[in-house]
């Protein structure tokens, strides 16, 4: 009779199998969750039951880990257990894990209209390639990895669009218990992230004189063959916000600000979702569509008018 495999042994076999057909960035993210959370809690076991997973979740919450991160960990754990079931190392598992109700609603942080105008005016008046990137993000809602990966060949002045087809990120790699980081240029994670973003008239006006003299293979943020990595660009963005005496919002707030301005301008939700490269429209609705009291009253009034 074959000796039962530990969860650690199953994880190693799963990683070897998974490595062949998922993106390196995804593999790296999975490996980090496994090494930091799954192996320390379950690695020495030969089976996992629901009460153990529920206790794991409650402990992680008590230690300050977000529900989103914990749910990401559970997704990886379930993939590993399905792999074990498929290979007949474990019986099939169906867990019903409970999370406490989140009392506070989390709203995205955005620049006010006045502060957004202040940033856009400044970066136009003080042109640098890094400032150009800030303007592009506020004009098109790009993620930081997408703007860092943007090259001049992606900017199509004739058709007035920016092609989003690459992302730049630094990933953690764990091999034989040795951890290191690596900067990788890759395609975006989902097919929806590969998209075209129309340029505003102001952006075309800014880019048209310089696009034709730029090397198409150079990165926009550096105008060189070597890119700026996201961590470095975040640091620059933070210093720019301090210089302008603006709130200390995360870089991602530029993307949130773009989306919020689109919604405020009555753009239809499906178009906003496509511009942002969201996997589905529900992501856009959950993040950006929060009717205020005045809008709710208007909705009720319109409903009763239709009954008369």
Regions found by a protein language model. Name each.
Residues 3, 15-83, 89, 105, ...:
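N-terminal core-binding DNA-recognition domain of tyrosine site-specific recombinases/integrases
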Residues 150-209:
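Conserved tyrosine-mediated DNA breakage-rejoining catalytic core shared by Y-recombinases
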Residues 119-122, 174-178, 286, 290-308:
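DNA/chromatin major-groove-contacting recognition/catalytic segments
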Residues 159-164, 220, 250, 261, ...:
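Short functional hotspots where side chains directly engage DNA or cofactors
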Residues 198-247:
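Active-site/catalytic core of tyrosine-dependent DNA strand-transfer enzymes
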Residues 71, 90-92, 96-144, 148-150, ...:
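Basic, Lys/Arg- and aromatic-enriched nucleic-acid-binding interface segment
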Residues 84-94, 168-174, 209-215:
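Proline-centered turn/helix-capping motifs that create local helix->coil transitions or kinks
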Residues 86, 135, 139-146, 239-243, ...:
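C-terminal catalytic core of tyrosine-transesterase DNA break-rejoin enzymes
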């Amino acid at each position: 009779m074959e000796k039962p495999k530990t969860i650690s042994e199953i994880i190693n076999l799963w990683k070897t199998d998974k490595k062949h057909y998922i993106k390196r960035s995804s593999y790296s993210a999975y490996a980090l969750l496994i090494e930091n959370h799954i192996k320390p809690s379950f690695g020495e076991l030969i089976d996992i039951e629901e009460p153990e997973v529920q206790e794991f979740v409650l402990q992680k919450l008590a230690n300050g880990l977000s529900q989103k991160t914990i749910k990401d960990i559970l997704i990886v754990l379930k993939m590993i257990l399905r792999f074990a079931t498929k290979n007949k190392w474990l019986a099939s598992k169906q867990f019903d894990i409970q999370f406490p109700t989140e009392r506070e609603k989390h709203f995205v942080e955005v620049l006010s209209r006045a502060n957004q105008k202040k940033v856009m005016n400044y970066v136009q008046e003080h042109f640098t390639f890094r400032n150009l990137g800030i303007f592009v993000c506020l004009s098109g809602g790009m993620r930081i990895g997408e703007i860092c990966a943007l090259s001049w060949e992606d900017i199509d002045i004739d058709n007035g669009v920016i092609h989003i087809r690459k992302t730049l990120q630094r990933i953690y790699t764990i091999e034989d218990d040795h951890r290191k980081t690596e900067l990788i240029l890759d395609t975006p994670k989902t097919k929806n992230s590969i998209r075209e973003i129309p340029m505003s008239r102001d952006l075309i006006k800014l880019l048209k004189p310089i696009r034709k003299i730029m090397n198409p293979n150079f990165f926009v943020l550096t105008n060189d063959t070597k890119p700026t990595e996201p961590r470095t660009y975040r640091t620059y963005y933070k210093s720019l916000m301090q210089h302008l005496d603006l709130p200390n919002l995360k870089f991602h707030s530029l993307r949130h600000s773009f989306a919020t301005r689109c919604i405020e301008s009555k753009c239809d939700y499906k178009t906003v979702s496509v511009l942002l490269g969201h996997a589905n429209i529900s992501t856009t609705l959950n993040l950006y569509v929060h009717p205020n009291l005045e809008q709710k009253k208007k909705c009720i009034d319109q409903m009763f008018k239709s009954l008369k």
